[in-house]
């Protein structure tokens, strides 16, 4: 057995009686007052594993005494020797880190070299001479094997994490038991926190490294795919840490999966072919050909015999099966379960039955097709009807450009909002136009609504900003004037609505335009009835459009005329008075001039822009519907 010793020199001046280690007191050490075993928290001979039996080492010296006991009770040394040797540890009351011998004035801590030489020759003499320190060979080996792991005992014991003592070759260096014990206690206490931090760091690093290795291994081994199905791996076993070999075994498994997948696809296709053969053919109408064929002006010629139109012929059954299924055989398509072996045998038996019935089914198909062709009677004339409809639509488009909006059929129709809103209709003529109904692409936008009678009250004369400001002020005897021949042109066939007394109304408009929109070819007609008291005033862009003519349908058509105009009606007929610059005195009596002409010009410009946008939208709609814009322009449609 070898004895390792080290020196801890301390000057005499440093021995302060009030000196105390702050970390070794009971409250700072984290111990209860009833727990006085301080050495037990620093030494753990089992290395925190509990695999070896605990050993008791007496590291306390008989000199650990209270200073008061040291001076007044010299006989306490022997008692300290017996108590510390028998118990293996010392109580807190016996600690004295300042007095190392019976002589308080001793300044040295060295031991006689002759004693060390005797210990080197006869190690057993050390146990007989120094009864305070007794360490056996097995206990010394346990001290050398102390690990840095934290103790796992719950009684507050901690492993001694101080560095192992290094052998010193100089025999002249001795150790003092009191200083050595104090040094061990102090170093263990001070290094406790550092060693705890280091051990926790090692533990975290080791745990993270192990966890990372296991997770990487699992990710490599468990990553599923269509060729390599996932394998059950136990995370705790040692075999799971090794990656799955990817050699001939993996290649063989991949080949087997590919062959199985191809076989299942082939069987699935055969099953689909069998199901198709058992069902009769379906007559599918090709809507694309039916719609596009309508633009052909003429009768269809059937190249197959004339019984059925080619647009309604049955579709051939030569479509490849793999085209009907999206992403067949891809990663998102699940494989068929291998437990369906009985179903596969049944499919093979059905395929054999299919081959026997092919001849009879083909005969049945031909008979069924001929019967289904006969009951649908509209197959032969469908293309002609489509072509006829297209021609009629083109004719109606051409008529809209040159016709005024003559609404006699919709004159009495009241919209849900209570206003008389009409739809543009073609001139009564060919019967093919009457058989058609307008859709969203064939009619122009409707005009603005016309207010009802309760909104058309008589108004006083307005400001000259309404468009009737003129410099030629010729006095007029009365607003009731006879009709001038050049301003009114009643339409032939009128039923007296154009004649009669002309009752004028003080109109504030420079020209009383209709409340409908203007087409590109001229003024448009508005819905009206003989019982209406008047029409709503609209400012006109030019002053030469104030004359009106009444037709037999009750609509009003602007035909051109003199200057500003005012409209009025009442009694049994509808009459109009055309105001001229000579009537300026009547229209501008008591009215101060204003600068509303700018507003008038701005509004007229906005109306013109609105009409232009509507016309462009109509042309775009016609072009989108497949019409010929050039022909429409030739017929009268212009942007």
Swiss-Prot record:
Q: Which InterPro entries match?
A: WetA (IPR040112)
- Report, from the record, the phenotype seen after gene disruption: Leads to slower germination, lower hydrophobivity and lower virulence of conidia.
- Which residue ranges have biased composition labelled Basic residues? 69-78, 246-255
Q: Which GO terms describe its biological process?
A: conidium formation; sporulation resulting in formation of a cellular spore
Q: Where is the composition biased (Polar residues)?
A: 81-90, 214-226
Keywords from UniProt, A to Z, are: Activator, Conidiation, Sporulation, Transcription, Transcription regulation, Virulence
Compositional bias ranges of the Low complexity kind = 256-275, 346-369, 506-526
Region annotated Disordered sits at: 65-97, 206-369, 418-552, 587-613
Function text: BrlA, abaA and wetA are pivotal regulators of conidiophore development and conidium maturation. They act individually and together to regulate their own expression and that of numerous other sporulation-specific genes. Acts as a crucial regulator of both conidiation capacity and conidial quality. Plays a role in virulence.
Q: Tell me its family.
A: Belongs to the wetA family.
Please state what the protein is called: Developmental regulatory protein wetA
Q: Which organism is it from?
A: Beauveria bassiana (strain ARSEF 2860) (White muscardine disease fungus)
What gene, per UniProt, encodes this protein? wetA
């Amino acid at each position: 057995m070898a004895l390792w010793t080290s020196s801890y020199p301390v000057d005499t001046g440093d021995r302060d009686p009030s000196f105390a280690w702050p970390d070794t007191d009971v409250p700072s050490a984290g111990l209860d007052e009833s727990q006085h075993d301080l050495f037990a928290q620093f030494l753990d001979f089992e290395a925190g594993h509990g695999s070896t039996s605990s050993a008791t080492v007496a590291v306390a010296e008989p000199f650990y005494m209270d200073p008061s006991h040291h001076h007044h009770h010299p006989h306490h040394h022997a008692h300290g020797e017996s108590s510390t040797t028998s118990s293996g540890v010392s109580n807190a009351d016996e600690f004295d880190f300042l007095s190392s011998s019976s002589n308080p004035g001793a300044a040295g801590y060295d031991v006689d070299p002759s004693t060390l030489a005797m210990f080197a020759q006869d190690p057993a003499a050390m146990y007989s001479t120094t009864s305070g320190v007794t360490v056996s060979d097995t206990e010394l080996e346990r001290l050398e094997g102390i690990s840095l792991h934290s103790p796992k005992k719950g009684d507050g014991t901690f492993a001694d994490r101080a560095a192992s003592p290094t052998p010193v070759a100089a025999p002249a260096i001795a150790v003092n038991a009191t200083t050595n014990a104090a040094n061990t206690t102090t170093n263990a206490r001070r290094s406790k926190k550092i060693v705890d931090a280091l051990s926790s760091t090692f533990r975290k690093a080791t745990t993270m490294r192990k966890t990372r290795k296991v997770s990487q291994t699992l990710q490599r081994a468990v990553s599923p795919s269509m060729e390599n199905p996932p394998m059950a791996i136990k995370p705790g076993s040692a075999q799971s840490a090794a990656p799955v070999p990817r050699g001939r075994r993996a290649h063989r498994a991949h080949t087997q999966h590919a062959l199985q997948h191809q076989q299942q696809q082939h069987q699935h296709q055969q099953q689909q072919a069998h199901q198709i053969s058992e069902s009769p053919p379906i007559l599918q109408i090709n809507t694309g050909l039916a719609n596009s064929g309508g633009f052909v002006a003429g009768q269809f010629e059937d190249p197959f015999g004339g019984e059925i139109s080619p647009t309604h012929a049955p579709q051939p059954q030569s479509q490849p099966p793999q085209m009907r299924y999206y992403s067949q055989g891809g990663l998102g398509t699940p494989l068929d379960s291998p437990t369906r072996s009985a179903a596969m045998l049944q499919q093979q038996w059905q395929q054999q039955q299919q081959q026997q019935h092919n001849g009879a089914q083909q005969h049945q198909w031909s008979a069924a097709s001929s019967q289904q062709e006969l009951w649908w009677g509209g197959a032969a004339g469908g293309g002609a009807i489509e072509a006829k409809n297209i021609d009629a639509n083109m004719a109606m488009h051409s008529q809209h450009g040159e016709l005024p909006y003559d609404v006699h059929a919709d004159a009495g129709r009241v919209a849900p909002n209570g206003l008389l809103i009409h739809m543009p209709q073609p001139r009564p003529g060919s019967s093919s136009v009457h058989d058609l109904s307008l859709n969203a692409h064939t009619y122009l936008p409707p005009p603005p609504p016309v207010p009802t009678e309760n909104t058309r009250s008589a108004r006083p004369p307005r400001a000259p900003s309404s468009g009737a400001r003129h410099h030629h002020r010729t006095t007029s005897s009365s607003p009731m004037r006879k009709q001038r021949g050049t301003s009114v042109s009643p339409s032939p066939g009128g039923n007296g609505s154009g004649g009669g007394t002309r009752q004028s109304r003080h109109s504030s408009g420079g020209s009383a335009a209709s409340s409908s929109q203007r087409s590109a070819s001229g003024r448009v007609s508005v819905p009206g009835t003989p019982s209406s008291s008047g029409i709503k005033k609209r400012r006109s862009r030019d002053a030469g459009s104030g004359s009106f003519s009444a037709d037999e349908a009750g609509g009003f058509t602007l035909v051109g005329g003199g200057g500003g105009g005012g409209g009025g009606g009442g009694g049994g007929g509808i009459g109009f008075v055309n105001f001229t610059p000579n009537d300026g005195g009547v229209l501008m009596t008591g009215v101060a001039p204003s600068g509303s002409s700018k507003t008038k010009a701005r509004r007229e410009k906005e109306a013109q822009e609105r009409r232009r946008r509507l016309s462009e939208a109509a042309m775009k709609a016609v072009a989108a519907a497949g019409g010929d814009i050039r022909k429409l322009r030739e017929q009268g449609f212009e942007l």
